Each structure stands twice: as C-alpha cells, then as structure tokens.
C-alpha cells in the first residue's frame, strides 16, 4: 500500500467460512448497540467491507478498533459548517475510548476559544491526549465566544478523534478529526496486521511517521463563536484578513494566501485590512483530488457486502448461515430529520457458535 495510509491489509486471501462477521460501531448510548455506518439512509462503500466479512469471531484478540473519519461520508468540512455540528452542553460527563488504527484525514481542526473576559472556553487536554497525527489541512480557529457553559460536544453523536484516543468533547489547542470508532473482526489473530510494511519501501524511509504526510495549517479568527451571528475571517497575517465563506476549499485558501503575498495586497498600515472575494470567483479547486484519495462516493451503492446485506430481505439458509444475530431493520422513511444520524440502530443479540465436523452451527444465547 506504500505510505498512503495507516491501514495495511494482509496479502494472503482470507479463508471462506461463515458470514458471522460484522463491523460494530461503538456508540456512547447504553440502550442499544448499533451496527454499520449510515449516511442519508445509505451505506457507504469502504475497504472494510472487502476484507472483514468472511469469518467468525473466535477470540477477542481478533477485535481491532479503528477510527473512521466522517469526511469520508461526504460531510461539509469547511469551518463555518463544521463548527455548527459542535455545541456546548452542561451536566454531561465526557467519555474517552482508545483505538488502534485510523485513516488519513484531509481536514482537522484546532480550537482556542476564550470568553470576552479572557477566560478559557475549552478544557485543557488530559495527559496522554495528543494531536491527531495524520492531517493534510489543520484548520486552526482562535477567537472569542459567549461559551454558555459546560463542554463542547458533537451534536450528531460522533467522536472527536485524537492520537489513538477518541473523546466526546473538544480539548483546547489540540488537533482533532471528526469520526466514529469501529471494531474490525479479523479472520484470525495477526500481530502484524496493522504493522505490515509497504510492498515497496521508500528510498529515504524514516521512522518519523509525520514525515509521510505534509501538513498545512490554515489560521482563522472568529467572533461570537457558537452563535447565530458567528463571523469567521481567514487570517493572512496579523493585520490582513479575508471574509470567510463556506464555499472556500482549503486549496483555494492556500492559493489565496500566496496571491495576497505575491501581489502585495497585505495591509501596509497599522490598521486591519479585510478583503471580500468576488462572488463570481470559482473557489471549488482541489475537491476532486480529495475524493479520489478517499475512494468514496456520495451516491448510494449496490455492492453485496456484509454491511449492505442488512438492507436486503433475509433469505432461507442452512443453520450454518442463518442470521440469528440481527433483528429486522426498521423500514426506511423519507421524513426529514433535524439532525443526521451516523449509525444504524439495530439491536445486537449475542449468539454462541459450535464447530462440529468442520461445520459451524450458531444459536442465540
């Protein structure tokens, strides 16, 4: 796979046995254990479908926790839109869970928000919580806001992914990516699954993981953070700014920054200079490069994978392949939801499997 991602697949083909394999999404709700990642009532194509759906779980050593980024599902990643998915809430204790491997993120975020009186809005990161390590662009936002109290949670129930730790809250000055935690069930325990080397080692191979990926930090200034009157400015230098719009891609902002410097359009006085971009300017550059890298699509897919099978009517099968671990999924409705739900909430029923004469039979407990 080279250095294009963290997750490395075993090269040998997996043994075909049974279909009792699932990607289990960890969600911090105690009343149900959801299964699968859903966007707009459609499942998303992922490499996970291609290699985890061929075997059964026989040992907890086969479970591997992986962080999956929301941006692969097509969420808007611009700062004005992304920050609307987060909000302050009091009386809810934060939760942290660790994960073993993750994706490369195109967009990460770093917040440093204060109240008008100078007090901090966000808590300091606990010991051991570090920046998300694989970010192409880090959107660093600093400024002020009313911060009504409590901690900053994700309104849609997702996690904030840090370096091998996922939290339900945002920490001050610590880079994160939005995502969820999934458990992969591997065909068998493999110690080298997440550490297998690339097929072709680079000539200048180094042990520093950060050297594999170039990170660009984009700075913003915000006023009235978290309110209906929030105003964002893209920061060129300490006196030169650009009025931020949701249509601006990271690639456009990088080019805009270079243009302002090369054309000598920065503030040449002691006063603040704020530019506004002409509405006719095309700002969509770079988006397709991102999607080609993620290898995902916003369109529904019809691949017969173990996740997409959840939406098909159950067929009559032998005992070895009868799906006893799932209850029927609720029918899809066209009613608009106020907030998106990233999880398909299907209750999970525990089952016990026995192997006799090379045949596996499973029954619910």
Swiss-Prot record:
Sites carrying sugar chains: 40, 204, 228, 257, 268
Disulfide pairings: 108-135, 121-147
One record GO biological process: monoatomic ion transmembrane transport
Keyword Repeat: no
Cellular compartments per GO CC: extracellular region; host cell membrane
Domain of life: Viruses
Keywords recorded for this protein, A-Z: Cleavage on pair of basic residues, Disulfide bond, Glycoprotein, Ion channel, Ion transport, Secreted, Signal, Transport, Viral ion channel
InterPro entries: GPC_FiloV, GPC_filovir-type_extra_dom
One GO MF term attached to the UniProt entry: channel activity
Site (Cleavage): 324-325
Name of the protein: Pre-small/secreted glycoprotein
Organism: Tai Forest ebolavirus (strain Cote d'Ivoire-94)
Gene: GP
